[in-house]
């Protein structure tokens, strides 16, 4: 009898502790009060526009950039909204303002340090390697240091202390690292040379996350890479007459997409390591690759043209893209219906594609672990219906 009772108590305790462990491993629902963003053009809401020489403004300073939603150029590298904009809409927050160049703007509900052309690794690294990366010197570490410098000011304008403010924020870490690969690829470096950068890039992203955790960050969304083998720029740069070099379903270049997967696998491994070190922090992996690649696999299912590899805005060649005659330059045309296209300017994607990606990340299955929206009211969650699926 005593033995049976002992077994029963032991079983109960095991079940009890298992329940606690499982519950603690699942992300709790949070009502985020702000978005803090780092990265490159994938998330840049206007920083590069303000950092540029006024006599040599970037292409995103001109129409048709911004025409679909904002009706004017905002510095976003798309015809309209980006993933970060759709995340802000879903959370009921204002669009995240760029830090650089903003005047009389409140950063209490968000601030964005992402800059077009930015790298995860510092500019000095590329100079030493003989790789040109002269779009900007605002690398991930520079963005983070800028954030640290202004953090006391951000906290002073809020009723919350600094750790509480970061704890209530969704911290978007990019995409970061894409340009670290773009520059050497466009200088015709070998793929083995470029692969050597991956551990360094992953470490730079990881170090930034750890710094932000030390400051009080509790929720991170860490994007992986894009399937660049489907971008008009890469398809043009590495165009070949060999049919076997292309994916028969999508028309993309598999070897380039495999490189993106190589990066993502290492990033996911590092995120798993960080989760073990910081079990109280929710570090979500955003699968940008598959969230976008599905659109290339079944374009008509998602409202896009069949085989939508050509850029909407551009000129020349099979993919409507020519280096030196890109979107935003005088005389370069653009399509009448950007919502039917995935590729926008050869490097970036359209608002319609961003919208589909954002839906897949916020509502699954492209965030790991998935967001928990159980504490939001039904009306808030219903807002996702505007994303499409």
Curated annotation (Swiss-Prot):
InterPro entries: GDSL, SGNH_hydro_sf, SGNH_plant_lipase-like. Transmembrane segments: none annotated. Glycans are attached at residues 104, 137, 320, 372, 383. The active site is at residues 41, 345, 348. Its EC number is 3.1.1.49. Sinapine esterase that catalyzes that hydrolysis of sinapine, releasing choline and sinapate. Sinapine (O-sinapoylcholine) is the predominant phenolic compound in a complex group of sinapate esters in seeds of oilseed rape (B.napus). Sinapine has antinutritive activity and prevents the use of seed protein for food and feed. Shows broad substrate specificity towards various other choline esters, including phosphatidylcholine. This is Sinapine esterase.
């Amino acid at each position: 009898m005593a033995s049976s009772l002992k077994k029963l108590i032991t079983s109960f305790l095991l079940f009890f502790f298992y329940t606690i462990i499982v519950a603690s491993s699942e992300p709790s629902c949070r009502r985020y009060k702000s978005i803090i963003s780092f990265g490159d053009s994938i998330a840049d809401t206007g920083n590069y526009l303000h950092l540029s020489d006024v006599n040599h403004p970037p292409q995103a300073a001109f129409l048709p950039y911004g025409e679909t939603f904002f009706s004017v150029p905002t510095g976003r590298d798309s015809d309209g909204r980006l993933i970060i904009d759709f995340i802000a809409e879903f959370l009921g927050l204002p669009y995240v303002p760029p830090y650089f160049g903003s005047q009389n703007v409140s950063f209490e509900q968000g601030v964005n340090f992402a800059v077009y052309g930015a790298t995860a690794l510092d500019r000095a690294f590329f100079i030493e390697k003989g790789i040109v990366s002269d779009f900007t010197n605002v690398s991930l570490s520079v963005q983070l240091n800028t954030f640290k410098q202004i953090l006391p000011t951000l906290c002073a304008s809020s009723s919350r202390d600094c750790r509480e403010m970061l704890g209530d924020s969704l911290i978007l870490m990019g995409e970061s690292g894409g340009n670290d690969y773009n520059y050497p690829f466009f200088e015709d470096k070998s793929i083995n040379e470029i692969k050597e950068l991956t551990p360094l890039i992953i470490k730079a992203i990881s170090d930034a996350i750890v710094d932000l955790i030390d400051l009080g960050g509790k929720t991170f969304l860490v994007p992986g890479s894009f399937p660049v083998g489907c971008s008009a720029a890469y398809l043009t740069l590495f165009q070949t007459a060999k049919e076997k070099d292309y994916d028969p379903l999508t028309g993309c270049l598999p070897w380039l997409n495999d490189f993106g997967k190589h990066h993502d696998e290492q990033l996911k491994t590092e995120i798993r390591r960080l989760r073990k070190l910081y079990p109280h922090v929710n570090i979500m992996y955003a699968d940008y690759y598959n969230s976008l690649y599905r659109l290339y696999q079944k374009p008509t299912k998602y409202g896009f043209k069949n085989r939508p590899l050509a850029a909407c805005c551009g000129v020349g060649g099979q993919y409507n893209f020519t280096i030196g005659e890109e979107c935003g330059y005088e005389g370069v045309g653009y399509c009448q219906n950007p919502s039917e296209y995935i590729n926008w300017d050869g490097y970036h994607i359209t608002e319609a594609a961003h919208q589909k990606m954002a839906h897949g990340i916020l509502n699954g299955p492209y965030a790991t672990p998935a967001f928990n929206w159980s504490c939001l009211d039904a009306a808030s969650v219903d807002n996702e219906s505007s994303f499409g699926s």
